[in-house]
Amino acid sequence: FEEKYYPAVKEMVYRTRLSNGLTVALLPKKEFKEVYGSVTIQFGSVDTLVTEVDGDVKSYPAGIAHFLEHKLFERKDSSDLLSAFTSLGADSNAFTSFTKTSYLFSATDHFLENLELLDELVTSAHFTEDSILREQDIIQQEREMYQDDPDSCLFFSTLANLYPSTPLATDIVGSEESISQINLTNLQENFTRFYKPVNMSLFLVGNFDVERVQDYFERKELKVLDVQEVVREKFVLQDVQQTDSMRMDVSSPKLAIGIRGNREVADAECYRHNILLKLLFAMMFGWTSDRFQKLYES
């Protein structure tokens, strides 16, 4: 493991890339009682258009990344991995964003056993047609819940107006139509394409011994490195829809203002760019700003 010290926060991070392509980062904190682990896959709701090896572009239903996140908790014997984590005294969860899917656990005991479950979660998939149909009903109910949330509707509608006719114009969970189009074949294809170590990263933080983790990976049988790159299609941007409105049952009107950037940001600059935007918007529209007070009072 390569060591890197961050003097500003007085933390030492250990980082390596395994022979199978998985990136591993460790942040030991002896003063913690728990260990927190997360594995992140570079696969989110916007990844619905991919370029095949032969150059053809293949399209998948919106919401497939989120659907796959749900299904991976199901084991071959129809039991679920959430219960397996619970039996070890751990909490487990997962979430899908526009660009990533993350699976996580927190535990005070059985650290390596929980790490094994996390590995199982992202390296094996067991789908059946019947279980997919059941999951469609569950996710449709989740989608309807978001549709009843004014803040969620406001956010996603604003995003859709900024990026019309792109994957960003659809909710992360998908639409009623796209959820019903998700099937066994396209779930298997996306699992094979995106869920490979070279497209994943593991982060562990908490009360653990670095040498013990290193020994765990040295003894573990790793898959062969798959270096085939996932080629994503770039968005074709349309004109911004400048104004829009909707009616919902709320106690007072809500307002959202969206600004679409006009340039690409390098990967290495994304984090800094994000912080700068948050600071800018907090000054312009934060609840302590003059602009916020004027909008609120009007």
Q: What is each stretch, according to the model?
A:
Residues 1-80, 188-292:
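His/Glu-rich zincin catalytic helix
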Residues 17, 28, 80-229, 261, ...:
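Charge-rich, well-structured scaffold segments of protease-associated domains
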